[in-house]
């Protein structure tokens, strides 16, 4: 190793400078994260209504209970034709034209003048017919349509009571009330179908596929706030966070202006905007900045709703444009999805502990600053809510106590400062990745200093060219390259150090001499990986990545590549499990020997087991996987979260870090096969350290705490495991000696 350092000291010094640059970049991000320490809760009004229906109290009582807990904001979704039909006293019926025209006599069910206007205009199956009864309903619906739809996209016909001439197939109400009939012009992209609809034969075989239109986006388009609901919330002194559902193709400046008029009519200037549907209001009209000006003039924070797999955000039209235009005056929003609502009395808990754990992780680990809260449901009943207020009170009180350890409090949600990586710093980070890449082959190939420097110069030219030509892609490539390169360098270090240990210590050295050396090698290897983690995180340490408007790409490849490199390293240092190999360079005969190796059956079995373990390890990576974590492990994780500032990674402190110590032990004992096996498992831990910091949304202090806990626990577990392996090895030697003696008799 000394020779390696001496030969490459110039490049190693340059690499150290690049790491220092990464620390400077990381320091700016640290400051931004340190000031982002307040979260807020917004109640979902519609589900609060459903909760109230199943309890002995009305919705006003329930809202008041949450208000008394300090939760003062309520998300109120504007009404649409769908909500008016399904959950309001107003008499409204909306039907896709595809359904209407299936009745050959449909014209007789509507006023002649209305039908004639439709015929003159022309219609298709993507349109919608609406029937409204009652003065209040007519006023609400027609004002919403006239204010938010293009004048050329609808027909309205009103009929004063008594209304007798026609017998509608879909009567909205009695005939002694005024009625209105509306035709809404739809497009093919507005149509909504049921998935996988088909006719079946009596033999349960598919007969024909059906593509019946069951609804339209026009039926979900927001029309306005319901006055009674607004009054209920405002009488309690609570703040309304209006939610408007906007859809592409029906979301121009006219729509946005009418939405804002509706807000102003009730004196609502929202603190946050949590967009619904497909877009932020007004973002069909690229030439009109009305919506953006409204957000900026009123200092409104826009919510980025996290997806239900807890990765990235739901990217509605206009979200990213607004984020950039408002200097990232946005916050991440965690919606309590239905599968989380059901986690009451889950994993053996008695109450809402697992829901609390979910909220805790969202706030602490993923930069979530608004919880869009929906009431808890029973885990064995999809429709029954938990109606015990003490459950909610206890959950939020416990959550706030746990968040105190992170200096996070509840109140007006804080906004992340806009932090960007300076251009020259980005170049330095890319050069660091390039230099590290040049140092890798020098760990296992006989490269002279001159050729290493020439290769480094060529790498620098390529890096600089990429920095100029593709700056956006450059940051991702630099981050990915650093994650691979430094994990490989750390693996090379501990394998070099393990082999040197075998040359310094005798094969029968006492465990007391091996363990301190193994612990030191583990600590240095983890520090090298941590330096790589800084180089990995630094290029992406900007606000857009912290808010998951962009994410690290290539996680699985970054985990696999160092494992493959370790195999090459081992072949260079040990050949085919040679006990007394002196050279540390890869030779052609090593490769030929490996290709011609006759593998024993027991090795094949062991490799198959290792392969299955590797597949399980990779398959569990990320949220979108079918390989689930066991209940026992989840409970253990939750307990660690409660005890420690950050939960250490199980694979690090229970497997990978102890295996690095075992690899050193096996090297000293001249057990090259076990050095290879334990070393391969240990390399997983070094990639895991870098992987921890690939999650840019996670605050840095958690990554440092997690790695520190893993290292400390890994040292303890590693010492225990090494002691156990030493005992087994001694028993094996005794058994083998007795077997040989018995064979000689």
Task: Identify the residue ranges that each predicted region occupies.
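Charged, low-complexity intrinsically disordered segments
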Residues: 29-42, 485-489
């Amino acid at each position: 190793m000394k020779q390696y350092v001496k030969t490459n000291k110039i490049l190693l010094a340059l690499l150290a400078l690049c790491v220092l640059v990464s620390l400077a970049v990381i320091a700016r991000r640290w400051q931004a994260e340190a000031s982002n320490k307040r979260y807020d809760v917004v109640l979902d009004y519609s589900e609060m209504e459903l909760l109230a229906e199943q309890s002995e109290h009305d919705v006003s009582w329930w809202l008041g209970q949450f208000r008394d807990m300090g939760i003062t904001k309520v998300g109120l979704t504007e009404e649409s034709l769908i909500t008016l039909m399904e959950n309001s006293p107003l008499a409204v019926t909306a039907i896709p034209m595809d359904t209407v025209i299936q009745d050959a006599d449909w014209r007789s069910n509507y006023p002649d003048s209305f039908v004639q206007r439709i015929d003159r205009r022309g219609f298709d199956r993507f349109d919608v017919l609406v029937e409204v009864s009652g003065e209040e309903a007519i006023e609400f619906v027609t004002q919403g349509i006239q204010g938010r739809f293009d004048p050329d996209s609808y027909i309205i016909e009103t009929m004063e009571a008594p209304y007798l001439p026609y017998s509608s197939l879909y009567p909205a109400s009695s005939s002694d009330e005024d009625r209105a009939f509306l035709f809404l012009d739809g497009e093919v992209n507005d149509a909504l179908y049921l998935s996988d609809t088909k006719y079946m034969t009596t033999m349960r075989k598919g007969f024909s596929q059906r593509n019946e239109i069951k609804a339209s986006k026009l039926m979900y388009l927001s029309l306005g706030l319901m006055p009674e609901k607004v009054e209920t919330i405002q009488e309690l002194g609570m703040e309304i966070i209006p939610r408007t559902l906007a859809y592409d193709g029906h979301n121009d400046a006219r729509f946005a202006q009418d939405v804002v008029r509706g807000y102003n009519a009730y004196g609502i200037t929202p603190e946050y905007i949590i967009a619904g549907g497909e877009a932020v209001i007004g973002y069909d009209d690229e030439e009109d900045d009305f919506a953006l000006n409204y957000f900026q003039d009123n200092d409104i924070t826009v919510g980025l709703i996290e997806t239900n797999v807890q990765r990235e955000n739901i990217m509605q039209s206009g979200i990213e444009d607004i984020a950039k235009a408002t200097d990232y005056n946005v916050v991440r929003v965690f919606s309590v999805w239905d599968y989380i609502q059901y986690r009451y009395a889950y994993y053996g808990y008695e109450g809402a502990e697992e829901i609390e754990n979910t909220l805790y992780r969202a706030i602490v680990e993923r930069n979530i600053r608004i919880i869009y809260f929906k009431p808890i449901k029973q885990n064995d009943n999809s429709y029954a809510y938990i109606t015990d207020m003490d459950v909610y009170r206890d959950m939020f009180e416990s959550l706030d106590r746990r968040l105190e350890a992170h200096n996070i409090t509840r109140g007006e949600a804080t906004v992340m400062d806009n932090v960007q990586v300076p251009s020259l710093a980005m170049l330095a980070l890319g050069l660091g990745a390039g230099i590290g890449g040049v140092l890798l082959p020098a760990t296992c190939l006989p490269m002279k200093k001159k050729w290493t420097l020439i290769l480094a110069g060529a790498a620098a030219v390529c890096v600089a060219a990429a920095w100029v030509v593709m700056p956006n892609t450059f940051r991702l490539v630099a981050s990915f390259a650093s994650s691979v390169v430094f994990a490989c360098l750390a693996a090379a270090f501990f394998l070099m150090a393990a082999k040197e240990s075998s040359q310094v210590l005798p094969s029968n050295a006492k465990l007391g001499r091996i363990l301190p050396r193994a612990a030191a090698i583990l600590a240095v290897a983890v520090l090298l990986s941590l330096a790589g983690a800084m180089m990995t995180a630094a290029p992406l340490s900007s606000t857009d990545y912290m808010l998951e408007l962009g994410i690290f790409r290539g996680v699985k490849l970054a985990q696999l590549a160092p494992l493959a490199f370790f195999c090459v390293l081992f072949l260079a240092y040990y050949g085919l499990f040679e006990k007394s190999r002196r050279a540390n360079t890869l030779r052609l005969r090593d490769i030929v020997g490996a290709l011609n190796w006759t593998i024993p059956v027991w090795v094949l079995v062991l490799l198959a087991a290792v392969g299955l373990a590797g597949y399980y390890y990779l398959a569990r990576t990320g949220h979108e996987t079918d390989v689930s974590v066991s209940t026992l492990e989840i409970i253990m994780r939750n307990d660690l979260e409660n005890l420690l500032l950050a939960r250490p990674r199980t694979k690090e402190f229970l497997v990978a870090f102890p295996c690095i110590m075992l690899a050193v032990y096996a090297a000293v004992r001249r057990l090259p096969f076990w050095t290879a096996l334990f070393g391969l498992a240990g390399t997983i831990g070094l990639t895991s350290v870098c992987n921890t910091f690939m999650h840019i949304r996670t605050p840095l202090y958690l990554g440092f705490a997690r790695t520190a806990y893993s290292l400390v626990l890994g040292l303890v577990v590693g010492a225990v495991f090494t002691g156990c392996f030493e005992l087994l090895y001694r028993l094996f030697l005794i058994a083998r000696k007795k077997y040989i003696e018995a064979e000689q008799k």
